[in-house]
């Protein structure tokens, strides 16, 4: 029996022992070494050749990932680790570090219970380090820390023991400060990483060695010994004495939770159903015999197997040939295969019980974020996955040959299922389709995959920026009349209070129609007026619809229509047909016809939409543009060039500091001005500068630019160049 066959047999056995399972993600800022780390863990487990680890890119299975040298999708593998005489099943997900692919990180965090956060010893904590930590902690995922590239501090920067310790300590302090500020209230202290306890490891993924305090105690090795070995060129000996796989996976087993521990506190946060119900107790008690409850976190298309879905099983057992129900899309599917991932391979195990990360095929129509259950026991949906970033750049695509239009539409629908952070708008009449993504690289990868993987020739437009609409002022009360003039609604709008808006962006407040009184307390704690807080009907697009009327007959009967109209109006605002956000609408009065026939959808929907549009156009409407944080590191002599380039892009400097001969600069720049930035900054720094970016959010577009950009957007969309005034909607 080969080593691989023995491992598969052991995995099949350990799958049924939740206390011996660890579901973990590896996440980091781009180029901090997490895929090299993943490869070496796979090599240590015998899944790829040790000689190729770090070059094999065992977790980067797509051609474009290997060509670019970055991880674009999340990749999975299961392996076995022995710790203190017991064997453990480690289900591992490697995630992207590039800001454009943060959606994969968020979805991966829903599938795992623990995360190995990788930080480069030279760069320290970087923008995406904070973002991936935020994504993990928001999903109640416990972190441990691996400080990578320690050999560079010794070999390149020539740090001695004291300087080395100072640099490593500063990284740990910074990571713990982030954990303390971002972790759930009851986990802030418990989840901070601790060197003495062994939840921090140091090493070199590339050179394949690592050490933490437990390993130091076992081997009597010190940092001085490590410095000596590096200086003497004996790092090959280090990997024998301090094997990376052993140190890292032992840390994972000891400090990250098993599913039967994690699901007790995670399930109530990510599932809206009744915890005391049979399904709820199946998840809390980890019963493989109870009702099936799972969530699909990723969808990919394989040319042989069709749709391959990654699914975390929270309750029951996923079985081959069983019929399952897709709760979100209200459809049934028959499972063709069910099993586990081993890097680029899948192993069909026939069954996958609670607590594991599974793959399944046969689920046509499934998309990431879908809840699955048994067809004969339908459950409540899991909470939607909140993505930290949102689409900010759009391209228009058309089929080169008109006859390929139906195929293009089908491919685009598939793309949006595989990656929910991609937003697709399909216009079957004109043949033009819009794809919106997280950035230039995100869209380049998606369009290249359509051309290369789907074998479809397409024409791709220049990138277009995604704007949003809002208001700067407070409108008067506006009357909206139904077409038959028998129904009238009185509405005004103003900007939503900043604490509420920020809480919606951060995910601290949930969107949706308000069903419970408890939600009002959350609004009040953020400074909202008590009476208004109790009367919020709907939260949508980071905006609120508040009913402040009293004793209006028949209002409850048209409530759903009013909210439908409110949501529809915000999808396409009146200024430029872009999404409207950050608004607070007050319904202060209404007059309704006594006969239900005269207050149906054809009357109520246009009345409320017109009132909303007129109120927005009466409240100093504005456009919001997406802003990126840009971090540049370059030799001091290039600092002036960097500042000049950023200022030419309407950017502003936020901070800068000097580290030896290197300047580190923080800027904020409109994404509209970031095209071609990589090449320009290379020229400005003589090829010696590095930069990284992070989405900051949306800010008000300077007023002197607004009219021109509104005209451009409206013309591109086939609308009249000038927006209508409020009187157009009040007529």
Swiss-Prot record:
Molecular function per GO: GTP binding; GTPase activity; translation elongation factor activity
Keywords, in A-Z order: Cytoplasm, Elongation factor, GTP-binding, Nucleotide-binding, Protein biosynthesis
Positions contributing to GTP binding: 28-35, 94-98, 148-151
Gene Ontology CC annotations of this record: cytosol; ribonucleoprotein complex
Pfam family, one: EFG_III
UniProt subcellular location: Cytoplasm
Modified residues (Diphthamide): 598
Residue ranges annotated for the tr-type G domain, each copy included: 19-234
Stored PROSITE patterns: G_TR_1, G_TR_2
NCBIfam families assigned to the protein according to its UniProt record, in alphabetical order: aEF-2, small_GTP
Primary role: Catalyzes the GTP-dependent ribosomal translocation step during translation elongation. During this step, the ribosome changes from the pre-translocational (PRE) to the post-translocational (POST) state as the newly formed A-site-bound peptidyl-tRNA and P-site-bound deacylated tRNA move to the P and E sites, respectively. Catalyzes the coordinated movement of the two tRNA molecules, the mRNA and conformational changes in the ribosome.
Family as reported in the entry's similarity comment: Belongs to the TRAFAC class translation factor GTPase superfamily. Classic translation factor GTPase family. EF-G/EF-2 subfamily.
UniProt protein name: Elongation factor 2
Origin species: Methanobrevibacter ruminantium (strain ATCC 35063 / DSM 1093 / JCM 13430 / OCM 146 / M1) (Methanobacterium ruminantium)
Taxonomic lineage: Archaea, Methanobacteriati, Methanobacteriota, Methanomada group, Methanobacteria
């Amino acid at each position: 029996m080969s080593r691989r066959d023995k491992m598969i047999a052991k995995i099949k056995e350990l799958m049924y022992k939740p206390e011996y399972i660890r579901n973990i993600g590896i996440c980091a800022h781009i180029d901090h070494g997490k895929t090299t780390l993943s490869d070496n863990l796979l090599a240590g487990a015998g899944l790829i050749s040790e000689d190729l680890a770090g070059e094999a890119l065992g977790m980067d299975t797509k051609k474009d990932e290997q060509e670019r040298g970055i991880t674009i999708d999340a990749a999975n593998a299961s392996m076995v680790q022995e710790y203190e005489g017991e064997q453990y099943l480690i289900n591992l997900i490697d995630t992207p570090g590039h800001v454009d692919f943060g959606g994969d990180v968020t979805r991966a965090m829903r599938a795992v219970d623990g995360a190995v956060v990788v930080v480069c010893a030279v760069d320290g904590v970087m923008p995406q380090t904070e973002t991936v930590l935020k994504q993990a902690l928001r999903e109640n995922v416990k972190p441990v820390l691996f400080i990578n590239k320690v050999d560079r501090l010794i070999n390149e920067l020539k740090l001695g023991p004291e300087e080395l310790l100072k640099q490593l300590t500063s990284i740990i302090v910074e990571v713990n400060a982030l954990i303390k500020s971002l972790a759930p209230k009851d986990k802030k202290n418990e989840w901070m990483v601790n060197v003495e306890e062994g939840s921090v490891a140091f090493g070199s993924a590339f050179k394949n060695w690592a050490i933490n305090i437990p390993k130091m105690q076992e081997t009597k090795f010190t940092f001085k010994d490590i410095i000596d070995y590096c200086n003497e060129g004996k790092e090959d000996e280090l990997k024998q004495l301090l094997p990376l796989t052993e140190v890292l996976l032992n840390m994972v087993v000891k400090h990250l939770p098993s599913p039967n521990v994690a699901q007790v506190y995670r399930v109530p946060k990510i599932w809206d159903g009744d915890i005391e119900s049979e399904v709820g107790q199946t998840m809390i008690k980890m019963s493989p015999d109870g009702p099936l409850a799972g969530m699909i976190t990723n969808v990919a298309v394989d040319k042989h197997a069709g749709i391959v879905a990654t699914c975390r099983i929270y309750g029951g057992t996923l079985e081959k040939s069983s019929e399952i129900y897709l709760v979100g899309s209200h459809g049934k599917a028959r499972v063709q295969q069910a099993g586990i991932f081993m890097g680029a391979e899948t192993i069909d195990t026939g069954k996958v019980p609670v607590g594991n990360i599974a793959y399944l095929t046969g689920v046509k129509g499934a998309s990431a974020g879908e809840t699955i259950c048994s067809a004969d026991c339908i459950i409540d949906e899991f909470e939607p996955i909140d993505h930290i970033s949102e689409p900010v750049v759009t391209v228009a695509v058309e089929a080169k040959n008109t006859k390929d239009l139906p195929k293009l539409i089908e491919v685009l629908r598939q793309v949006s299922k595989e990656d929910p952070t991609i937003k697709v708008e399909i216009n079957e009449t004109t043949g033009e389709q819009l794809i919106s993504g997280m950035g230039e690289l995100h869209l380049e990868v998606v369009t290249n995959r359509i051309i290369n993987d789907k074998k479809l020739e397409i024409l791709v437009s220049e990138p277009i920026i995604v704007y949003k609409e809002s208001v700067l002022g407070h409108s008067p009360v506006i009357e909206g009349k139904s077409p038959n003039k028998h129904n009238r609604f009185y509405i005004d709008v103003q900007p939503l209070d900043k604490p509420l808006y920020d809480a919606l962006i951060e995910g601290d407040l949930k969107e949706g129609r308000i069903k419970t009184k408890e939600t009002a307390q959350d609004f009040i704690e953020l400074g909202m007026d008590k009476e208004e807080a109790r009367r919020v009907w709907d939260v949508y697009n980071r905006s609120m619809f508040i009913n402040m009327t009293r004793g209006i007959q028949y209002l409850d009967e048209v409530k759903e229509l009013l909210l439908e109209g409110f949501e529809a109006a915000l999808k396409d605002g009146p200024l430029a047909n872009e999404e409207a956000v950050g608004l607070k609408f007050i319904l202060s009065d209404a007059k309704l016809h006594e006969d239900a026939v005269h207050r149906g959808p054809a009357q109520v929907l246009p009345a409320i939409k017109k009132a909303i549009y007129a109120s927005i156009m009466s409240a100093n409407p504005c456009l919001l543009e997406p802003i990126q944080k840009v971090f540049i590191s370059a030799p001091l002599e290039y600092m002036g060039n960097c500042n000049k380039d950023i200022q030419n892009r309407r950017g502003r400097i936020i901070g800068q500091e000097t580290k030896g001969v290197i300047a580190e600069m923080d800027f904020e720049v409109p994404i509209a001005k970031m095209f071609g930035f990589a090449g320009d900054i290379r020229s400005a720094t003589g090829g010696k500068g590095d930069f990284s970016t992070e989405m900051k959010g949306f800010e008000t577009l300077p007023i002197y630019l607004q009219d021109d950009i509104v005209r451009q957007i409206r013309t591109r969309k086939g609308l009249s160049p000038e927006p209508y005034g409020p009187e157009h909607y009040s007529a």
